[in-house]
Amino acid sequence: MATSDIQVKELEKRASGQAFELILGPRSKEAAPEFPLSPPKKKDLSLEEIQKKLEAAEERRKSHEAEVLKQLAEKREHEKEVLQKAIEENNNFSKMAEEKLTHKMEANKENREAQMAAKLERLREKDKHIEEVRKNKEGKDPGEAETN
């Protein structure tokens, strides 16, 4: 488009800016349009070309299906690994808890046995003391009877 086909008309001028109006001249018949008005006509496809396109589409479909199946298999494998790891961690936790409980029970048993042994020792000491007091008392009783 030539510059002589364009007219610039100033509409108003303000502090905020200016406004213009562009007036375009009529199109010349010599200028070719920049884009075609209608899409180019498609050529008629032969049976072989159609068959090739169908086969290519089938290959793409099969390839896509294989990719999806591969992704599903990988996902299932990952799920199996995660599940196996969770089971293993659970077993380890159970084993550790059982060992801890067994150790605690053994410690409690040893503590209880030690307390029982200490009580028995105190009872023996008391019995021994009582026996000594009895012997001392029996030894003193005949003498006390004479003095009364």
UniProtKB/Swiss-Prot annotation:
Span of domain SLD: 4-145
One Gene Ontology MF term: tubulin binding
An individual GO BP term: negative regulation of stress fiber assembly
Pfam family of the protein (one): Stathmin
Superkingdom field: Eukaryota
Post-translational changes noted in the entry: Many different phosphorylated forms are observed depending on specific combinations among the sites which can be phosphorylated. MAPK is responsible for the phosphorylation of stathmin in response to NGF.
Gene3D superfamilies named in the record: 6.10.280.30
Places the protein is found: Cytoplasm, Cytoskeleton
Alphabetically ordered keywords of this record: Coiled coil, Cytoplasm, Cytoskeleton, Microtubule, Phosphoprotein
Residues found modified as Phosphoserine: 16, 38, 63
Descriptive protein name: Stathmin
Family affiliation: Belongs to the stathmin family.
Coiled-coil positions: 41-140
InterPro entries in alphabetical order: Stathmin_CS, Stathmin_fam, Stathmin_sf
Function: Involved in the regulation of the microtubule (MT) filament system by destabilizing microtubules. It prevents assembly and promotes disassembly of microtubules.
Species, as recorded: Gallus gallus
Quaternary state and interactors: Binds to two alpha/beta-tubulin heterodimers.
